[in-house]
Amino acid sequence: MQCAHYSAGHCHSCQWLEKPYSQQLEDKQQNLKQLLPQAIVKQWLPPIASQQDAFRNKAKMVVSGSVERPLLGMLHRDGTAVDLCHCPLYPAHFQPVFDVVKSFIACAGLTPYNVARKRGELKYLLLTESRHSGEMMLRFVLRSETKIAQLERALPRLHEQLPQLTVISANIQPIHMAILEGEKEILFTEQKAFKEQFNGIPLYIRPHSFFQTNPKMASELYATAGRWVRELKISSMWDLFCGVGGFGLHCADKNTCLTGIEISSEAIDCARDSAKTLGLENIEFQALDSTHFAVAKDQIPQLVLVNPPRRGIGKVLCDYLSKMVPDYILYSSCNAQTMAKDIAALANYRVEKTQLFDMFPHTEHYEVLTLLVLNHN
């Protein structure tokens, strides 16, 4: 992938950009093998490659510059701004959207937040696209509600120019820290969510919902999880840290008893909408802490699927699973190091198979899916 920002030394977020892509995959696979001792892994499946450019469905842009000439991109530690509207990780059709939004910022008088002076209102722009429908969600992250009225007054013109923006909101983040978003969300559109679809499974995305930024890889990951689970012929499962339900909905059929647990109530609303659309009546989704939910139960399903944040599932949940011994654990991780630590704590299990998904090309990061099977002896 060619990148003018990288070549000019303005952005080195893609640390491995100069490394041939085949070598990137090889190095990631080698890293995974070093973390999981080969003696306990029955089957190493080949890594799944990504598109090398234009693969992202989401842009997280720091807003800087002036209200008349805003910049969308990133800030270096010294305060230098870099406009990344032409970043090759984004699809080409994002660029005209950025151009219109820049004009809108000027029209609405949304003064970019100045970190050094702690002045201004507009901190970030978050743009997300459904590859299924082409719909987009645009979120303005503001320091306060001061500019809400004038932002809302200017929106009809933005809708006219960009009808694909079906969900528009403002997020209020008043803290002077590098925190992407706050708790309060103000919706300007009747539509609260847009629909993505992977492998025939509808997934609904709302402003606060976490969603993978590489849809092709997410689709492959979910499909693989579904295929592995169907081969096991199980009838009951938990989907812990379930987000909007992508894993569980790919694994369950009408006869599967599935409980999905996620701390975000907004994500759970999305998961419930998907289950309703699919007509899955034996599924329930609850907005709870996944670990607290699990350890309070004295019975466990045949399979427990976990997709934790980078910190892993942790000692408490590992101890519980070791005690309750479900037949299978399906572990999806964005941090193989913490996954390996958790697997080491699950001494009653062997690794049946593992597969790497290159969710983050040109970086050292990747996603990995691992099936653990209980050693009955």
Swiss-Prot record:
Purpose of the protein: Catalyzes the formation of 5-methyl-uridine at position 747 (m5U747) in 23S rRNA.
NCBIfam families reported for this sequence: meth_trns_rumB, rumA
Single GO biological process annotation from the record: rRNA base methylation
Gene Ontology MF, one: 4 iron, 4 sulfur cluster binding
Annotated source species: Photorhabdus laumondii subsp. laumondii (strain DSM 15139 / CIP 105565 / TT01) (Photorhabdus luminescens subsp. laumondii)
Name of the protein this chain belongs to: 23S rRNA (uracil(747)-C(5))-methyltransferase RlmC
Substrates-to-products reaction catalysed: uridine(747) in 23S rRNA + S-adenosyl-L-methionine = 5-methyluridine(747) in 23S rRNA + S-adenosyl-L-homocysteine + H(+)
Pfam families hit by this protein: tRNA_U5-meth_tr (PF05958)
Active site: residue positions: 334
Keyword Methyltransferase: yes
UniProt-annotated binding residues for S-adenosyl-L-methionine: 212, 241, 262, 307
InterPro entries with a match to the protein in the record: 23SrRNA_MeTrfase_RlmC, MeTrfase_TrmA_AS, MeTrfase_TrmA_CS, SAM-dependent_MTases_sf, U5_MeTrfase_fam
EC number(s) from the headed UniProt entry: 2.1.1.189
